[in-house]
Amino acid sequence: MESLRKSSRSTKGKNTYLEVLRRQEEEEYEQRVNRPKKEKVQEIVHCSPCGTTDANYVEDEDPYGEMIQCDQCDTWQHINCMLQVKDIKVPKELENSDDVDSLSKLLVNSEDKYYCDRCIYKSQLREERRAYKELNKSEMIGDNDILDEPKEHPDEYVDDQDEDQDFILSKDTANIAEVDDDEFVENDDNRVKKDKRKRKPSNSAITTTKTVPKKKARVITDDQTETETIPSEDSYAKVRTNARKMLVTLFKNYIIPDTLKNNVFEIVKGHDEQSISDEFAEEMESKLFSHCRSISNYKTLISVYTEKVRVLFSNLKDPKNLSLKEAVINRQLDLEQLVSMSATDLANPDLQSMKKKIDSQKIDSLVIPNQPLDKLKQDNSEDDHNSFEFTNPTFTKTFNPKDIHESNSNNRPYTTDSPTNSYTDEPDSMKSDSNNGVDTNDQNILNVKFKLDYNEVDLNVVGTFKFLGSTLLDENQEHKIYQAVVGDGKLIYEGRLHTKIATEYISEIKTTRAVLAYQLLPSASHREKYEQLVEFMDDLDRVLGMKPRKPYVKNMYILSSLLGKLPDILQILTTDESIAKKRIDLSRINDNDKTLYLVVVVKPEIV
């Protein structure tokens, strides 16, 4: 029998590497345990109302009295300053009193904690952001459930002929760390995704085939009808719960405190701020959901509902909108009527008065001619259609009879049936242009109409393009592409993007990318929806991303302008001295208190 082979190593059964790791962990643990405790944070003076800080604070010479320390940030503020900021009424017996303890009790909450004005604001801001985040998250989940979208995301769009490898961000690529000027298009969560399936390569070497049974055809009897699957009430539960949370925050942190502060509302005995907020939020959410359901179908209900929540929240949060808050909290305004009000009606009185002022100025500036309209007269020649001329001496040109016979094709407001009294009204198309301030002879008006279909909020707008100019392009390049970039005028919606992000993007590429600017003027029949879209975009502080139609086009954005204010992007493109060949002419803009602009980013090197 052979002898077994034995090892003579003294370290048999031991792993030196693991031993070293174990010793390192023990040493690190001992260091953490024996680490000296941190020193107490140095006390800091920071009183925002009076501007007192450590740099200018002298304890013996301070004229504002005693201080109190915040339990969250450990900074010190004057008691009198905080009483004024928080608008706390001081009892008569404590006026001009030096009793610091009694005055301090007026600033503490039910938990005997005092928080400065900055900490309270940050807390409210965090709560508001959390509510917005939950609402957006539930909106995405609700849309996926309702629209029965596929779980996988759509493939990225890649232009093979583009050297810069343009792509449109999907949800999976929205947080890529590398920043490129093509990444500033945000896909909207509400878009219905296409179910793209990858094809499997065929293998000619495989001779055997597998038979796949055919699906049986669906048979519908006479007493059955094929209908769409309508979502149940449970599918809306998530988004409605988050909306109620936002409304509770709205009443608790903004409406009730502001009305109490201005003595226009009193809390009845047996009730508190929380119970009142819960009651109003539940009733208001129920009315709002019923209203949104009545004006939309089940596919667009979630998007319409969430946008309406945001509009109500932002307007009722406005400190200048005290009259609306008073009407709501005192039930002077019915909640059913409140949820059906437009963004313009919900705006604070200052904005509404400004709008009325602008409208009145436009009416006052309208000039109506005193002279009667020019008519046609017939010459004394034997031929009725020999020649016609204007009676106004400023018009001396004689028209050819052929021009009069072609009046229908040229949209001229005259007929030839009865030359003496044949003046007719202008066609509807000319009326719509005149009503909107569109000059048909303006060379900057493109000969193609735009059509914008924003189906997510059921807004479809039709109108005309007015070219404003470009940057970084010479005259030949501009003349070559200024009409080609819009193609047939159909603007294909891709997604929304925050205005701040779009402005930062334009600031980054303003010296390397050319930008063409247009004003979008609505037709008369679409003006109402056009203004609704402007208000909708302004409330969200968003721009709309359009799908590029040409290989040299990088991005297309639609901007909104309310009360005649020029968007920040156009201000950058017209005032920045670092931009070469600035050819954008703001004098071409039609004066409207609500208007839309289109900016097109192109690559000048491949134009």
Swiss-Prot record:
GO cellular component assignments: nucleus
UniProt feature, compositional bias: Basic and acidic residues: 374-387
Disulfide bridge map: none
Bias (Low complexity): 388-399
Main location: nucleus
Gene that specifies this protein: BYE1
Protein name (Swiss-Prot/TrEMBL): Transcription factor BYE1
Xref: SMART domains: PHD, TFS2M
Stored Gene3D superfamilies: Transcription elongation factor S-II, central domain, Zinc/RING finger domain, C3HC4 (zinc finger)
Similarity section: Belongs to the BYE1 family.
Composition skew (Polar residues), residue ranges: 407-424
Zinc finger (PHD-type): 44-122
PANTHER family recorded: IP08861P-RELATED (PTHR11477:SF0), TRANSCRIPTION FACTOR S-II ZINC FINGER DOMAIN-CONTAINING PROTEIN (PTHR11477)
Keyword check for NAD: no
Function, in words: Negative regulator of transcription elongation.
Family annotation (InterPro entries): TFIIS_cen_dom, TFIIS_cen_dom_sf, Zinc_finger_PHD-type_CS, Znf_FYVE_PHD, Znf_PHD, Znf_PHD-finger, Znf_RING/FYVE/PHD
One Pfam family hit: TFIIS_M
TFIIS central domain boundaries: 239-374
Region: Disordered, residue numbers: 180-210, 369-440
Keywords: Metal-binding, Nucleus, Repressor, Transcription, Transcription regulation, Zinc, Zinc-finger
Alphabetized GO MF terms: RNA polymerase II transcription regulatory region sequence-specific DNA binding; zinc ion binding
Cellular localization per UniProt: Nucleus
